[in-house]
């Protein structure tokens, strides 16, 4: 709707709906974390007590949650029998069984970002940023969200976007995942391609330790993990393939990191960079689903953690145009951009050296 055509009353109604939706997102987050959504998906119409008992939760809290989920038109309520149900077509978008279609995972970020609201407001007045240490849950949630996509699509959909890559990995290649987190992608690739060698690189000691422990538990001799600051990484011609999953826009020095990636690749090597699907031009993002959410995530996390390190503050919505330009500046001359159906949030950049 154009602002010139919208009345004050229409705007008021639209904003009231936005507030209502924010409340609903929190309820969905609670339903995901408590297992209520998964529990209800497996139940016939049931009372609040029956649902609480099935989920192992306190009935009074469950009943209040059901009230909001009913008025939010996610849960159906039968007043005659005092029973609640979660229709299958909604469960198919809100439960763990939905895999990468599970929108309840994204809903968790609404309350998480609210936890740092006052700290971000202080930065509006004083400058600087909010450091990673203030987000103890963020990386766990990111791992959960990206893990859904990885499990469903990494081996069979994402890697084949790079022409010839699966065959190259089956033959044996040196691969690094920059900003690997706890190593979900490294684990999946190492399991699928035993002839290749995979190195996960991350700034976090905790992430590197978790990845190392998981690789040992699974007996993955072809997966190792190293702690490095990507902006200071000094590897030359070390890898045939480098992957980066939603990590560049958070970097304090993203241009330097891309240059280091280019240097670390061997001639003929390839970078598979996954990052947020958006335009670098604000006007192109107006009316695009989840754009407001992405700008909010940038303000409340991605931009500010970079600024906390005296970084560039690139932000979540740096966009396709800037991304391809920065890849070119780093030395990549052959860059293509792909999309996959199971991931509505990201572009897949394929850059060859």
Curated annotation (Swiss-Prot):
Which Gene Ontology BP annotations are present? cellular response to hypoxia; methylation
Domain text:
Consists of two domains which are linked by a long alpha-helix. The N-terminal domain is essential for dimerization and the C-terminal domain has the class I MTase fold.
CDD domains (UniProt xref): AdoMet_MTases
Q: What is its EC number?
A: 2.1.1.-
Subunit info here reads: Homodimer. Co-immunoprecipitates with DarG in the presence and absence of darT.
Q: Which keywords does the record carry?
A: Methyltransferase, S-adenosyl-L-methionine, Transferase
Q: Which GO terms describe its cellular component?
A: peptidoglycan-based cell wall; plasma membrane
GO molecular function annotation? methyltransferase activity
Please give the name of this protein.
S-adenosylmethionine-dependent methyltransferase Rv2258c
Organism of derivation: Mycobacterium tuberculosis (strain ATCC 25618 / H37Rv)
Q: Which PANTHER family match?
A: METHYLTRANSFERASE TYPE 11 (PTHR45128), S-ADENOSYLMETHIONINE-DEPENDENT METHYLTRANSFERASE RV2258C (PTHR45128:SF1)
One of its Pfam families is: Methyltransf_31
Q: Which Gene3D superfamilies match?
A: Vaccinia Virus protein VP39
Q: What class of enzyme is it?
A: transferase
- Its biological function? Probable methyltransferase that may target bulky nonpolar molecules with aromatic rings.
């Amino acid at each position: 709707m154009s602002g010139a055509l919208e009345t004050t009353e229409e705007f008021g109604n639209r904003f009231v709906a936005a507030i209502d939706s924010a409340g609903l997102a929190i309820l969905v987050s609670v339903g995901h974390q408590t297992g209520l959504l998964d529990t209800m998906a497996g139940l016939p119409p049931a009372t609040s007590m029956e649902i609480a008992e099935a989920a192992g939760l306190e009935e009074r809290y469950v009943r209040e949650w059901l009230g909001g989920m009913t008025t939010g038109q996610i849960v159906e309520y039968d007043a005659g029998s005092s029973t609640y149900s979660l229709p299958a077509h909604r469960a198919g978008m809100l439960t763990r069984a939905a895999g990468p279609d599970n929108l309840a995972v994204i809903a968790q970020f609404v309350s998480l970002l609210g936890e740092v609201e006052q700290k971000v407001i202080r930065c509006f007045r004083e400058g600087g940023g909010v450091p990673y240490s203030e987000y103890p849950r963020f990386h766990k949630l990111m791992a959960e969200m990206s893990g859904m996509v990885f499990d469903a699509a990494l081996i069979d959909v994402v890697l084949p976007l790079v022409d010839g890559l699966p065959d190259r990995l089956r033959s044996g290649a040196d691969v690094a995942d920059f900003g690997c987190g706890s190593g979900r992608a490294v684990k999946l690739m190492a399991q699928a391609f035993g002839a290749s060698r995979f190195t996960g690189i991350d700034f976090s000691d905790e992430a590197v330790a978790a990845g190392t422990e998981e690789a040992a538990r699974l007996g993955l001799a072809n997966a190792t993990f190293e702690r490095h600051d990507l902006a200071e990484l000094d590897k030359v011609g070390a890898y045939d393939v480098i992957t980066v999953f939603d990590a560049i826009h958070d970097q304090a020095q993203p241009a330097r990191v891309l240059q280091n990636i280019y240097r670390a690749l061997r001639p003929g090597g390839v970078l598979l960079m996954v990052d947020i699907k958006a335009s670098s031009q604000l006007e192109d993002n107006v009316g695009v689903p989840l754009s407001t959410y992405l700008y909010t995530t940038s303000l409340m996390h991605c931009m500010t953690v970079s600024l906390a390190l005296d970084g560039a503050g690139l932000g979540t919505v740096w966009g396709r145009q800037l991304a391809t330009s920065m890849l070119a500046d780093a030395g990549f001359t052959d860059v293509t951009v792909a999309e996959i159906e199971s991931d509505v949030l990201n572009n897949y950049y394929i850059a060859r050296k």
